[in-house]
């Protein structure tokens, strides 16, 4: 009897969905309190003035204003929100 031996199953064939990480509000954009500025794993960007950080390292605005990214010594990038009064003056 001619039989074909059962073929093995592939060990690849799976992939995880993208996690939608990254900057959601770029420098110069207007934000209101609670707006998400960036989603990240770990601290790629650090919270600066008027920016809070959630338990999953998400950065969010605490006040209404304009987003600003600023590189500091040590290679860290801080994200701040300049309040409306300061942003209007510039």
Swiss-Prot record:
InterPro entries per record: Ribosomal_bL27, Ribosomal_bL27_CS
Keyword Ribonucleoprotein recorded: yes
UniProt-recorded Gene Ontology molecular function terms: structural constituent of ribosome
One Gene Ontology cellular component annotation held by this UniProt entry: cytosolic large ribosomal subunit
SUPFAM superfamilies assigned: Ribosomal L27 protein-like
GO biological process, one term: translation
Keywords of this entry: Ribonucleoprotein, Ribosomal protein
Ranges where the record places region Disordered: 1-20
Assigned protein family: Belongs to the bacterial ribosomal protein bL27 family.
HAMAP family: Ribosomal_bL27
Protein name per Swiss-Prot or TrEMBL: Large ribosomal subunit protein bL27
Lineage: Bacteria, Pseudomonadati, Pseudomonadota, Alphaproteobacteria, Hyphomicrobiales
């Amino acid at each position: 009897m001619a039989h074909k031996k059962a073929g093995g199953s592939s060990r690849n064939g799976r992939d995880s969905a993208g996690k939608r990480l990254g900057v959601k509000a770029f420098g110069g954009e207007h934000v209101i309190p609670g707006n998400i500025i960036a989603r990240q794993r770990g601290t790629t960007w650090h919270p600066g003035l008027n920016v809070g950080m959630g338990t999953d390292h998400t950065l969010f605005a605490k006040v209404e204003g304009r987003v600003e990214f600023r590189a500091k010594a040590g290679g860290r990038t801080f994200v701040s929100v300049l309040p409306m009064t300061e942003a209007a003056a510039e």
